[in-house]
């Protein structure tokens, strides 16, 4: 039986032939390269290159074998001698001490400049940090040289150098110096760690060092999470990008420019978009050729600067990328296969290195703008600027005075004398710094200029730093400062310096005066030690009797009794109990009050001081409270004290004894509803105290409580009578009929009782308590004074329980309490009332209670002087028990002078007390003897090293106070340099203490130091976030016009556009203009500095190009410019961290972000305004409109962040599985969307084979021509995919076979030439190969002993040559 030969099956990838052919060109030539002998040290990098070379040249098998041999070699030597590190291997270079010494010398000179007020605090900080950074770099070189020359086989050096473990920066910390660290705010601490881990850190260094270490750990933890989420978003946005076409046939391409004549790896694996010709028009690379490393080299050697290549950005394949535009798959360096999921590969390639990126960079505090392009003089000679030179003064960040070039010009150094040397020429670019003057004679090797290359205007930001005073004294301004008052929008007035100048603090002893002190001495007066400088007095507010107390701590207390109230008609009785002392007040009529407070304590107004001990309102047991009509209380329950009675009356009390038991029911010794006598045992060990009817409450056989209610029970069957009463009970007045046979001649409380045995009424007796309207008060309970506070006692009656409240208790309770409360009027809150005891004047054995209001005055103790206060001396002006009036002086404090000198009072300001004064002492001046004529006059300020006379120089900084023929007197001082626009915190003539803030320096620092770096920056770019304070971009091309405003600050910037219309731009405060007047600008160019908003950029580009080109081209061009910018920005972040990612990966992602446009006006199309739609789709629609003559749709391109793009994909299944599931699914349902299952994600979710790899189904046309006996595959095609019901994972080869055997051929029809090549490549001999080599085992084709295939089928296979005779 012969098997029917199927035609070529549908799974044939026709394209693979082409790719083989392409590759065949290169493979054999490479394979024939002769073996080369590499004689050099092989480190990690060389090893990497070696393996990669082997793989490219000789394929997998050879590489695997070679890698194995390399491994064996490594192990062999590792077993002979291990590379381990001991402390001895950490060798500190000897040059270290010299380098640190040099740095310290530099810093000392910087500090000296700062001390002399030549540079500002900011400049000092910058210089110090730069010095240390430079030292650290030089030390790294020293470490390298030390190892290289003295110990090249050192373990540490070998590991770091070969790249096996560690890197130079780690070795630097081990044997160099740890270097500068940042504090938690991210600012660099200008104290570096000079030691290394080998020498050991000091305690201070250890603490500083651990800041950075902790930050590192936290960073790493956050980084992994962030990077993982980034990868997820990237995968989601690009998961449906699959290589689906051979060639999209586009004519568009992107341009790659060489950097410094090199392309690096940027061309490798890309296809040329057009023929590449050299300078002589010879063809180097034909169109559509893959560029390999050797071709890339050829291009570089031909000095070609730009190459047009194909890119996923310009690919026109619908919803996918074609092979030609994508280029090589970097896994095997051959053209990418059809069906490859390049989107996911791109996402992983960008997301994976995320963990290696740092999170945040340090705010360097305006640090290290590396000295770019420093030019030194090569010869001795005279400097000459060309005629067109324009320069202006400039101060460098290190405080060096220099000049800045405003235009490009040529600078020459003409050799001096008869020197035969040629003149040195220096090209000075605009923005460069010059350190020499025109016509200046200079020596060789002098720094002449610092040439800046590229964009001069760096984006800067404003930062501030405080200037803190180092010594006490008086502030003086230099005239150059020209401070002016500036009012901001909120109306606050600040003082600002207009020019660079010095702020002086002239030394002196500054005294802080207490709040109410007044100076008692005039200015410019000589004082001795101990002279009184100022006095402060303390007064009594209300007057009264003085009491002097013993001093406490560092102050004495003077008490003045302003009011006192003696309770002369009460005896104070003291009782001792086991819990302490208890005091009672007994009045003359025998009433006893319990005192709530004890003598010696302090109380405040309104507090209860005593309770009436009243037995009249005490009950025997618990019970029910009822208020009779007439008795009323104040609504609010006053705290925990009960309800205050507002009107007296009768309180009714129905006794009831309640025992809380909570024991087992078996202990009950009486019955429910039984009548018992007082003293009956109701539960074991519990006895009733009253007679009455027992009620038992129980739950789950637990006895909860037993109630004994007094009264009598009357059985009654009459429903009418029973219904008049309730179980809660109600009061019945005397004489009212209740039930036959019962006379009631008193108030009764009647309750209805129903039990299982009987029904009836319980009549209970009621006790009455009469409550008076007003409580009785003892006499003399009020003291009034003409001035000052007064005292009074008030009696308050409070009921403890509210109307209808049931008190569950066995013991009795107190129903009414009478409180004595204390009230004081006109007392200030800080006054307290003291409780005292006094012996009775006539009888010593009797104690009385005295209440007093005290005014307490703390009198300062004498103090010894300290740095900011003089010594003080305090005198009391009153005696004990003296009567004083309100406003009398109680004590005066004098501030005494510490040392002799001259007093100066600050200038008086209206209504402001003098808070400080200064004494200029002898030690604040120095005398300098002079021989020649004095060169200075009184009031001049000099710094160290300034000439004072013809022979003498100043030895200190200060102000000249007097000049005579013999000597000059200098008052010591300290200058502080203040930069323009700094905020001054002190005025001229103010007195300051050490540590006070003098000014706030406002300086500009380059933003490069602390822009968002690393992961957050990548996220910012890919999410297309709008940055804060973004720059102003030019909307349309034109010429810039800049006009100065009326005041110094404001500037208006406008652009005169092509059609002569003027577009004015609003500038924000603090934005720097990046263009000059008259400059030609294009749409999308920066007008001011700051981060670029990508959405605005796209908008500006589109608006500008749209004026000159048709809509479609404008959209394409603007998108293309933005795409290149995005790719470069992302690359910059990764490159700065040393991570290499191929451009094509980023391009795939950026393509997804920029593929949509927003419809502005639908024209005659069926699109909706505001709809986001693929550019390609709009293009097709508009083309159709142009044929039919309808109005096309107007649109603008949009940039979507990766999250937005993921949610806006065509597939709602994919979008819903990403974020906002409910919203996405709801909208899809309302719109009746269909999901065409094009991407990977949607197929995975519903459990189909994914349309990539083997599940990729190729093109319809090919399938149609090759379908052979299985046309059903094409039964219903949608978008190049098979529908679910027809989807087969593989194409089955038809073979006659027994029902028990089925095989799924992996490779297709044996006649296929691909099969031949595969066999040859794998070295498979068809005659000897077994069937299994071509069949994928599945559940059905596992042969078992009793299940051999039928002989006829085997015969057929043998004929095919698929089975050997065995």
UniProtKB/Swiss-Prot annotation:
Its cofactor is Zn(2+). Zn(2+) binds at residues 248, 315, 322, 325. It comes from the Bacteria. Residues 1-25, 1290-1366 are annotated as: Disordered. It is an enzyme of class 2 (transferase). GO terms for cellular component: DNA-directed RNA polymerase complex. InterPro entries: DNA-dir_RpoC2_beta_pp, DNA-dir_RpoC_beta_prime, RNA_pol_Rpb1_3, RNA_pol_Rpb1_3_sf, RNA_pol_Rpb1_4, RNA_pol_Rpb1_5, Rpb1_funnel_sf. Belongs to the RNA polymerase beta' chain family. RpoC2 subfamily. DNA-dependent RNA polymerase catalyzes the transcription of DNA into RNA using the four ribonucleoside triphosphates as substrates. HAMAP family: RNApol_bact_RpoC2. This is DNA-directed RNA polymerase subunit beta'. It comes from Prochlorococcus marinus (strain MIT 9515). The lineage of its organism: Bacteria, Bacillati, Cyanobacteriota, Cyanophyceae, Synechococcales.
């Amino acid at each position: 039986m012969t098997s029917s030969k199927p035609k070529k099956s549908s799974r044939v990838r026709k394209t693979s032939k082409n790719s083989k052919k392409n590759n065949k060109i290169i493979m054999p030539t490479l394979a024939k390269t002769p073996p080369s002998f590499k004689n050099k040290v092989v480190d990690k990098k060389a090893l990497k290159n070696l393996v990669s070379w082997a793989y490219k040249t000789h394929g997998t098998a050879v590489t695997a074998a070679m890698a194995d041999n390399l491994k064996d070699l490594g192990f062999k030597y590792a077993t002979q001698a291990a590379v381990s590190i001991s402390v001895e291997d950490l060798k500190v270079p000897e040059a270290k001490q010299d380098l640190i010494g040099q740095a310290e010398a530099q810093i000392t000179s910087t500090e000296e400049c700062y001390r002399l007020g030549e540079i500002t605090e900011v400049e000092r900080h910058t210089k110090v940090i730069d010095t240390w950074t430079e030292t650290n770099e030089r030390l790294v070189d020293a470490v390298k040289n030390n190892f290289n020359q003295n110990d090249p086989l050192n373990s540490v050096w070998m590991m770091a150098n070969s790249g096996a473990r560690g890197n130079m920066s780690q070795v630097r910390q081990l044997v160099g110096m740890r270097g500068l660290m940042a504090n938690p705010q991210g600012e660099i601490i200008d104290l570096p760690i000079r030691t290394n881990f080998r020498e050991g850190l000091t305690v201070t260094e250890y603490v500083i060092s651990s800041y950075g270490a902790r930050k590192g750990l936290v960073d790493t933890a956050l980084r992994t999470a962030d990077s993982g989420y980034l990868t997820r978003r990237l995968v989601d946005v690009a998961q449906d990008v699959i290589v689906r076409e051979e060639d999209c046939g586009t004519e568009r391409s992107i341009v790659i420019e060489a950097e410094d004549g090199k392309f690096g790896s940027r061309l490798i694996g890309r296809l040329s978009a057009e023929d590449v010709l050299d300078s002589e028009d010879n063809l180097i690379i034909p169109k559509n050729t893959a560029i390999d490393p050797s071709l890339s080299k050829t291009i570089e050697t031909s000095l070609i600067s730009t190459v047009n290549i194909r890119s996923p950005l310009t690919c026109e394949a619908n919803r996918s990328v074609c092979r030609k535009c994508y280029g090589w798959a970097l896994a095997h360096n051959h053209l990418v296969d059809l069906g490859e999921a390049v989107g996911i590969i791109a996402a992983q390639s960008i997301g994976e290195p995320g963990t290696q990126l740092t999170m945040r960079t340090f705010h360097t505090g305006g640090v290290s703008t590396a000295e770019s392009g420093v030019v030194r003089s090569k010869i001795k000679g005279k400097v000459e600027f060309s005629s067109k030179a324009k320069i202006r003064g400039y101060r460098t960040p290190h405080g060096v005075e220099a000049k800045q070039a405003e235009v490009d010009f040529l600078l020459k150094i003409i050799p001096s004398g008869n020197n035969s040397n040629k003149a040195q020429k220096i090209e000075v670019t605009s923005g460069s710094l010059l350190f020499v003057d025109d016509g200046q004679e200079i020596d060789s090797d002098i720094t002449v200029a610092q040439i800046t290359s590229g964009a001069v205007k760096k984006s800067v930001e404003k930062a501030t730093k405080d200037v803190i005073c180092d010594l006490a004294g008086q502030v003086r301004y230099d005239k150059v400062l020209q401070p002016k008052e500036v009012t901001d929008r909120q109306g606050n007035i600040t003082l600002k310096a207009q020019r660079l100048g010095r702020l002086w603090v002239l030394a002196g002893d500054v005294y802080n005066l207490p709040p109410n002190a007044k100076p008692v001495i005039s200015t410019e007066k000589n004082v001795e030690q101990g002279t009184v400088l100022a006095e402060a007095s303390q007064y009594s507010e209300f007057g009264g009797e003085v009491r002097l107390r013993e001093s406490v701590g560092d102050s004495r207390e003077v008490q003045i009794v302003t009011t006192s109230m003696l309770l002369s008609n009460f005896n104070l009785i003291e009782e001792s109990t086991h819990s302490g002392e208890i005091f009672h007040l007994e009045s003359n009529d025998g009433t006893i009050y319990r005192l709530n407070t004890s003598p010696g304590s302090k109380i405040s107004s309104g507090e209860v001081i005593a309770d009436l001990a009243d037995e009249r309102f005490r009950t025997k047991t618990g019970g029910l409270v009822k208020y009779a009509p007439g008795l009323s209380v104040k609504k609010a329950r006053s705290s925990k004290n009960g309800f205050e009675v507002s009107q007296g009356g009768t309180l009714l009390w129905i006794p009831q004894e309640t025992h809380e038991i909570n024991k087992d029911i078996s202990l009950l010794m009486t019955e429910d509803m039984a009548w018992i006598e007082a003293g009956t045992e109701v539960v074991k060990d519990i006895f009733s105290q009253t007679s009455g009817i027992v009620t038992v409450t129980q739950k789950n056989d637990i006895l909860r409580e037993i109630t004994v209610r007094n009264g009598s029970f009357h059985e009654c069957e009459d429903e009418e009578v029973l219904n008049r009463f309730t179980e809660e009970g109600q009061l019945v007045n005397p004489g009212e009929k209740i039930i036959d046979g019962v006379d009631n001649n008193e108030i009764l409380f009647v309750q209805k009782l129903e039990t299982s045995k009987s029904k009836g009424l319980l009549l209970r007796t009621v006790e009455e308590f009469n409550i008076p309207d007003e409580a009785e008060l003892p006499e003399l309970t009020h003291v009034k004074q003409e001035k000052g506070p007064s005292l009074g006692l008030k009696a308050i009656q409070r009921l403890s329980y509210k109307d209808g409240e049931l008190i569950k208790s066995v013991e009795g309770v107190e129903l009414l309490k009478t409180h004595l409360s204390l009230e004081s009027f006109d007392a200030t809150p800080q006054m307290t009332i003291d409780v005292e005891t006094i012996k009775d004047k006539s009888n010593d054995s009797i104690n009385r209670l005295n209440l007093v209001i005290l005014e307490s005055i703390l009198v300062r103790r004498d103090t010894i002087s300290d740095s900011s206060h003089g010594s003080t001396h305090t005198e009391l002006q009153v005696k004990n028990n003296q009567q004083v009036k309100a406003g009398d002086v109680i004590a005066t404090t004098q501030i005494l002078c510490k040392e002799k000198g001259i007093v100066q009072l600050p200038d008086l300001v209206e209504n402001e007390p003098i808070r400080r004064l200064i004494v200029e002492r002898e030690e604040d001046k120095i005398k300098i003897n002079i021989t020649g004529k004095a060169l200075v006059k009184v009031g001049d300020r000099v710094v160290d090293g300034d000439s004072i006379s013809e022979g003498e120089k100043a030895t200190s900084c200060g102000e000249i106070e007097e000049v005579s023929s013999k000597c000059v007197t200098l008052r010591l001082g300290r200058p502080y340099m203040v930069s323009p626009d700094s905020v001054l915190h002190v005025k001229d003539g103010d007195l300051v203490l050490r540590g006070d803030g003098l000014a706030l320096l406002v300086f500009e620092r380059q933003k490069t130091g602390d822009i968002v770096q690393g992961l957050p920056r990548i996220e910012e770019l890919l999410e297309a976030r709008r940055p804060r304070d973004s720059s102003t971009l030019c909307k349309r091309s034109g010429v810039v016009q800049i006009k100065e405003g009326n005041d110094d600050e404001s500037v208006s910037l406008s652009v005169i556009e092509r059609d002569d219309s003027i577009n004015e731009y609003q500038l924000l405060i603090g934005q720097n203009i990046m263009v000059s007047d008259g400059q030609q600008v294009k749409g999308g160019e920066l007008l001011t500095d700051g981060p670029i908003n990508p959405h605005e950029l796209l908008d500006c580009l589109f608006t500008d190009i749209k004026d000159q080109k048709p809509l479609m081209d404008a959209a394409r061009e603007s998108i293309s410019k933005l795409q290149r910018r995005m790719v470069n920005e992302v690359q910059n972040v990764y490159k700065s961290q040393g991570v290499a990612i191929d451009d094509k990966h980023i391009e795939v992602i950026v393509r997804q972000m920029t593929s949509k446009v927003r419809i502005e006006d639908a024209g005659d199309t069926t699109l909706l305004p505001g709809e986001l739609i693929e550019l390609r789709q709009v293009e097709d629609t508009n083309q159709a409109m142009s044929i039919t003559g309808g109005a096309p749709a107007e649109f603008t391109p949009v940039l979507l962040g990766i999250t937005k793009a993921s949610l806006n994909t065509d597939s709602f299944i994919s979008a819903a599985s990403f974020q906002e599931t409910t919203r996405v699914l709801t909208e899809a349902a309302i719109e009746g969307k269909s999901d065409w299952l094009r991407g990977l994600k949607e197929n995975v979710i519903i459990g189909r084979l994914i349309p990539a790899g083997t599940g990729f189904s190729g093109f319809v046309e090919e399938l149609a021509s090759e379908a052979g006996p299985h046309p059903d595959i094409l039964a219903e095609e949608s978008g190049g995919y098979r529908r679910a019901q027809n989807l087969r994972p593989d194409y089955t080869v038809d073979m006659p076979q027994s029902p028990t055997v089925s095989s799924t051929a992996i490779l297709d029809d044996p006649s296929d030439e691909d099969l031949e090549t595969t066999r040859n490549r794998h070295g498979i001999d068809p005659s000897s190969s077994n069937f299994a080599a071509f069949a994928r085992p599945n559940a059905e084709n596992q042969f078992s002993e009793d299940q051999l295939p039928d002989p006829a089928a085997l015969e057929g296979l043998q004929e095919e040559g698929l089975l050997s005779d065995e």
